[in-house]
Curated annotation (Swiss-Prot):
Residues 272-283, 476-490 have a biased composition (Polar residues). The gene is KIAA0408. This is Uncharacterized protein KIAA0408. It comes from Homo sapiens. Keywords: Coiled coil. Residues 259-286, 461-490, 643-680 are annotated as: Disordered. PANTHER family: MCG7194, ISOFORM CRA_A, RIKEN CDNA 9330159F19 GENE.
Length: 694
């Protein structure tokens, strides 16, 4: 009650103070208005006097000039000879002009002196703002009556004009003071409100700094990007022009794709704690691997691979022939790096190189890089170019990669990189900014929701390899075949069959069991998924299907929907991780088996051991579970619980809880678990697609 009374008292006091100030303001405003009217009257009187004196001065000067003309004309006519009347007239005009100039000079001098005297008088007689004009005007009137001469009248007119200017200046000062006084009263009356308003206005607008790297390492040259300046330049280019035009993309290629990625619709990425940067151990292992490879047969390909691995500029069709001589060739060490191999997708059309859109990315598996789990939504935000006839980006073959390029184009990017016609990489371990507070919050959320601190050890790798017909799971089940592949090529990995990139016959490695692969691009992607979600899914077997069967809380504050979305997102991400890691392992074993001379068996064994050690280390650091060649007979429900339904890259939005129909689960038999059924489903699809590919 005391607070209520105090509030009422302050309100009444404020109201009284406001009324008093308003009354004071009205009184002073009336006073200023009356003074302003007096000033206006004085100014009008001065203007009339100035006009009268100007007319008088003009008339008097005209009379004097006429009298002078009358006196000088007969004298000049007498002096001029009758034989030369023109000369006499010209001399008369000259003398007349000289006399006029002298008179004008005298008049100007008198005006200047009169102005100086008037300024001195004004300085001496300046008094109050209102009453200083009355004695000035009376003095001017007396002076005008007392001095009938031309010079005094001119001085008087000058003084009147000076008084007029000073009056105008004083009027401007008075109006300024009136305005400032009004503002002062307004501020005092609204003191409390102005305090709160100014406090709210002075609150800084928090701007989110884009999470990315401002420097791009492009062929060991650092190119700084100022997004602020380039946004205005490239906004029109992004909206109006085609992305695949040659000159515009070469000039502003890096900034254009950066802006394009920023201007895509803000589809929220899934919440993750996937900011697992490679530690110093992974870097040291990678450096040892790189030094080992530097002494082998990678060095001759350095210039060409560096040229082809310029990630920011599209390659013209004239350079396609330079790309393909090394296409399909394996190195002497039998190791193929999957550095920055883009996934190529086009529509179901004949191989005419039209409507080819390079829309996905691939990160290096050699260093501890991770692929963002938001593959599905990012694939939709990438734009498909319309005219690749003139210029198109050729996906670089993994056999051409050089270990130095992994350093110059660091693939440990914290965001998923687009390889649409201009590819952009945010790179560098030490320059990547990290939001520590956000990471801590997400870790706390994950510990609370998923209880990830119970099981933090990675599941051991399973190296048992089986047949290709049982192991292969295609990345795209709706793909159509455009060429022919042998079964030995099927073992070596998954081939994307919907990309029309013809490869010459003579560029295939001379292996009698292999055929020419037309229209195929190898897809090898590494993935180090976050530790917590993988183990959480294995420990609890949480899926959207299991979660939706549990009773939903009626509390509006429950985060049931958030958890369900997270589970759906990471289910799709972990399925792609399993496929990609298995694909890499199959490719690795096939490469080691298909080596054609040049390197000893001990070198291959050493490289294989280094690869296995490196994979084990990265699995411990990032919590990755790599399943390489798992037999479907040994798959249990726990091991396959992370597999999601194969289909589109996004999940259908969930219906409200009270309207879910039981027909969604009617097709399932109650005895068989859903994970095993999903496994067999994928198995049949892989057999069918393999039959298409062979």
């Amino acid at each position: 009650m005391d607070l209520h009374k105090q509030w009422e008292n302050t309100e009444t006091n404020w109201h009284k103070e406001k009324m008093e100030l308003l009354d004071q303001f009205d009184n002073e405003r009336k006073e200023w208005e009356s003074q302003w009217k007096i000033m206006q009257k004085k100014i009008e009187e001065l203007c009339r006097e100035v006009k009268l004196w100007r007319k008088i001065n003009i008339n008097e000067s005209a009379k004097i000039i006429d009298l002078y003309h009358e006196k000088t004309i007969p004298e000049k006519v007498i002096e001029s000879s009758p034989n030369y009347p023109d000369l006499g007239q010209s001399e008369f005009i000259r003398t007349n002009h000289k006399d006029g100039l002298r008179k004008e000079n005298k008049r100007e001098q008198s005006l200047v002196s009169g102005g100086n005297q008037m300024c001195k008088e004004q300085k001496a007689t300046k008094k109050s703002k209102v009453g200083f004009l009355d004695p000035l005007a009376t003095d001017n009137q007396k002076e005008c009556e007392a001095w009938p001469d031309l010079r005094t009248s001119e001085e008087d007119s000058k003084s009147c004009s000076g008084a007029l200017s000073t009056a105008l200046e004083e009027l401007a000062k008075v109006s300024e003071e009136l305005c400032s006084f009004q503002e002062e009263i307004r501020k005092r009356s609204n003191h409390r409100r102005m305090k709160s308003d100014s406090f709210l206005q002075e609150m800084p607008n928090v701007t989110n700094i884009p999470h990315g790297d401002p420097m791009i390492n492009n062929d060991q040259c650092i190119l700084p990007i100022s997004l602020e300046k380039e946004k205005q330049k490239n906004r029109k280019n992004l909206s109006c022009t085609n992305v695949l035009q040659s000159n515009s993309t070469k000039k502003c290629g890096i900034d254009t794709i950066d802006l394009k990625r920023n201007e895509t619709p803000p589809v929220p990425p899934p919440r993750s704690t996937s900011r697992n940067f490679p530690s110093s151990d992974s870097e040291q292992a990678y450096e040892r691997w790189k030094e080992r490879l530097d002494h082998n047969s990678w060095v001759p390909h350095e210039g060409r691979s560096k040229r082809n691995y310029n990630p920011h500029f599209p390659l013209r069709q004239q350079e396609m022939s330079m790309l393909y001589p090394n296409e399909g060739k394996t190195s002497k060490d039998g190791i193929i790096f999957s550095s920055l191999v883009p996934e190529v997708k086009i529509d179901s059309k004949p191989p005419s190189n039209e409507d080819v859109g390079l829309s996905m990315w691939s990160c290096d598996i050699g260093i501890g890089a991770k692929r963002s789990p938001s593959t599905s939504w990012f694939q939709k935000t990438c734009s498909t170019p319309s005219n690749p006839k003139y210029e198109m980006v050729i996906p670089d073959h993994p056999a051409k990669s050089h270990p130095d390029l992994h350093v110059s184009n660091d693939c440990s990017s914290s965001v998923a990189e687009s390889s649409s016609p201009l590819r952009n990489f945010s790179c560098g371990f030490e320059r990547t900014t990290r939001n520590e507070k956000l990471a801590a919050k997400t870790d706390e959320f994950n510990r609370t929701v998923f209880r990830t601190d119970r099981n933090c050890q990675a599941i051991q790798q399973n190296h048992s390899c089986s047949k290709s017909s049982e192991d292969l799971k295609p990345c795209d089940t709706s793909s159509t075949h455009t060429g022919s592949i042998s079964q030995s090529n099927d073992v070596s990995g998954i081939w994307k069959t919907n990309a029309h990139m013809p490869v010459p016959m003579e560029n295939v490695p001379d292996n009698p069991t292999k055929k020419s692969t037309t229209g195929l691009v190898r897809q090898m992607q590494g993935h180090l998924s976050p530790r917590s979600y993988r183990n959480m899914l294995h420990e609890h077997d949480w899926r959207p299907s299991n979660l939706s069967g549990r009773p939903r809380s009626a509390d509006p504050r429950s985060n049931y929907g958030v958890v369900e979305k997270l589970l759906k997102t990471y289910e799709t991400a972990t399925e792609s991780a399993l496929q990609n890691s298995k694909c890499f392992q199959d490719n690795w074993t096939k490469c080691n088996s298909d080596v054609s001379g040049g390197a000893t068996l001990s070198q291959h064994l050493e490289m294989l051991q280094m690869e296995q050690q490196f994979q084990q280390k990265t699995a411990v650091w990032g919590g990755q579970e790599v399943k390489q060649g798992i037999d479907p007979k040994k798959i249990t429900e726990e091991s396959m619980s992370v597999n999601a339904s194969h289909g589109k890259g996004f999940s259908r939005p969930a219906r409200p809880a009270n309207r879910r129909l039981p027909s969604r689960w009617a097709s399932r038999s109650p005895s068989a678990p859903p994970a095993l059924r999903r496994t067999t489903h994928n198995y049949t699809i892989s057999l069918r697609s393999e039959a298409l590919m062979v």
